[in-house]
Design a protein with these regions (language model features):
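PLP-dependent class I/II
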Residues: 1-117
Length: 117
C-alpha cells in the first residue's frame, strides 16, 4: 500500500478526520431528507434516505423506470438511476442520491417536483 494511501487512512481516524466525516454524513442525510420531503409533498411514495444517501421512489403515471429517466433528464435536467438497472424487481422504481451540496439538492428537488406535477 502506498505511503499516500496509508496517510489518508490515518487521517480519517484523527479527530479532524472524524469531524469532517461526521459533517459529510450529516450533509448527505440532510439532503436525503430534503429529497424525501419534496417527493412526499407531491404524493410520491419514496423509501430510504434515513440510513444511507440513496432514495427510491415509485415511478408515477405508469411510466417505466427508463421513461422516468428520460423525462427527468430531458425535462428538468436531473439524473438518477432507473430501477430496472437493478434487475426486473427494480422496474417501476427510480433511485436518486443525496451526494450534492444542500443548495444543488434543493434546486434538484424543485426541478423534480415541477417536472412531475
Amino acid at each position: 500500500m502506498s505511503y499516500i494511501t496509508q496517510r489518508a487512512a490515518e487521517a480519517v481516524y484523527s479527530d479532524e478526520g472524524r469531524r469532517q466525516l461526521k459533517e459529510n454524513i450529516n450533509c448527505y442525510l440532510g439532503n436525503a431528507k430534503k429529497i424525501t420531503d419534496g417527493l412526499e409533498s407531491i404524493n410520491i411514495r419514496c423509501f430510504g434516505g434515513r440510513n444511507s444517501p440513496y432514495i427510491w421512489f415509485e415511478v408515477p403515471n405508469g411510466l417505466t423506470s427508463w421513461q422516468m429517466f428520460d423525462r427527468l433528464l430531458n425535462t428538468v435536467q436531473v439524473v438518477g438511476t432507473p430501477g430496472s438497472g437493478f434487475g426486473t424487481i427494480g422496474e417501476g422504481y427510480f433511485r436518486l442520491t443525496a451526494f450534492a451540496g444542500p443548495k444543488r439538492t434543493l434546486e434538484a428537488v424543485e426541478r423534480i417536483k415541477n417536472g412531475l406535477i
